[in-house]
C-alpha cells in the first residue's frame, strides 16, 4: 500500500449528503476483483449522461477539478452496502483523501485499508474547505498527516483527529497484509517450533 504522509493537491467540492456506495461505484461494475480500472466509472451515474457523454455540470468533469486528489463532501459519505470497490474506485481515480462531516463506518474502515485518508470535521470547517475547493486549480489544499493539519490556500490551518494506530499504518503504507508480514520472523519461528513438537500436523494438513 502506498504511504500517506503529506498530500498537496486540488480539492473537488461535492456538497451532497448521504452519497452511498452505489453512487460512488454502481453495482454493474462490481464483477471485477481487481483494484484497478474502476476510476473511469467513479460516480458513473452523475459523471455521465444517458448517452454516455460526460455531464458537463458534474464537478469532476470540469477542467479545474479533473485532477483532484482530495474530495470535500457532505455528511454520511459512503453509506449503503459494504462494497470495498468504493474506495478502490476513488483511489484509482486519484482521490487520496476524503473530507466530510461524517462517514459510514464500514466505508470509513475500508478507506484506511486501501491508503485513503478519511477526515471527519465539523460542518463549519467543511463549509470553509468547500469554499476553498471552489477555487479549483487556482487553489490547493495540503493534508499533513504527520502533524494532523489541513492547510488552505490562504495559509489557514484546520486540525483533525485520527486514531494513532491508523495514522501509523497510513504513514508507513501498511495494510492488513503488510502488518502480517512485519511478524514474518515470529511466524517462521512458530512454524519451526510446531513442526518439531507436532510433526504429524503438516502431514495431516496435506491429507
From Swiss-Prot:
InterPro entries: 3-IsopropMal_deHydase_ssu, Aconitase/3IPM_dehydase_swvl, AconitaseA/IPMdHydase_ssu_swvl, IPMI_Swivel, LeuD. Gene3D superfamilies: Aconitase, domain 4. GO terms for molecular function: 3-isopropylmalate dehydratase activity. It comes from the Bacteria. GO terms for biological process: L-leucine biosynthetic process. Its EC number is 4.2.1.33. GO terms for cellular component: 3-isopropylmalate dehydratase complex. Pfam families: Aconitase_C. Keywords: Amino-acid biosynthesis, Branched-chain amino acid biosynthesis, Leucine biosynthesis, Lyase. Pathway: Amino-acid biosynthesis; L-leucine biosynthesis; L-leucine from 3-methyl-2-oxobutanoate: step 2/4. It catalyses: (2R,3S)-3-isopropylmalate = (2S)-2-isopropylmalate. Heterodimer of LeuC and LeuD. Belongs to the LeuD family. LeuD type 1 subfamily. Catalyzes the isomerization between 2-isopropylmalate and 3-isopropylmalate, via the formation of 2-isopropylmaleate. NCBIfam families: leuD, PRK01641.1. This is 3-isopropylmalate dehydratase small subunit. It comes from Rhodospirillum rubrum (strain ATCC 11170 / ATH 1.1.1 / DSM 467 / LMG 4362 / NCIMB 8255 / S1). The gene is leuD.
Amino acid at each position: 500500500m502506498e504511504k500517506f504522509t503529506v498530500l498537496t493537491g486540488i480539492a473537488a467540492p461535492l456538497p451532497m449528503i448521504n452519497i452511498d456506495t452505489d453512487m460512488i461505484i454502481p453495482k454493474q461494475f462490481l464483477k471485477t476483483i481487481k483494484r484497478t480500472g474502476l476510476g473511469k466509472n467513479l460516480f458513473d451515474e452523475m459523471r455521465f449522461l444517458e448517452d454516455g457523454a460526460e455531464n458537463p455540470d458534474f464537478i469532476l468533469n470540469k477542467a479545474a477539478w479533473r485532477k483532484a486528489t482530495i474530495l470535500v463532501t457532505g455528511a454520511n459519505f459512503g453509506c449503503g452496502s459494504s462494497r470495498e470497490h468504493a474506495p478502490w474506485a476513488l483511489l484509482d481515480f486519484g482521490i487520496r483523501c476524503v473530507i466530510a462531516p461524517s462517514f459510514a463506518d464500514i466505508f470509513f474502515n475500508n478507506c484506511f485499508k486501501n491508503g485513503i485518508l478519511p477526515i471527519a470535521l465539523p460542518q463549519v470547517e467543511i463549509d470553509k474547505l468547500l469554499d476553498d475547493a471552489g477555487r479549483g486549480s487556482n487553489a490547493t489544499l495540503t493534508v499533513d498527516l504527520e502533524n494532523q493539519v489541513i492547510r488552505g490556500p490562504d495559509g489557514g490551518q484546520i486540525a483533525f483527529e485520527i486514531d494513532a494506530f491508523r495514522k501509523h499504518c497510513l504513514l508507513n503504507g501498511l495494510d492488513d497484509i503488510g502488518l502480517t508480514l512485519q511478524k514474518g520472523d515470529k511466524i517462521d519461528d512458530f512454524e519451526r517450533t510446531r513442526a518439531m513438537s507436532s510433526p504429524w500436523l503438516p502431514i495431516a494438513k496435506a491429507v
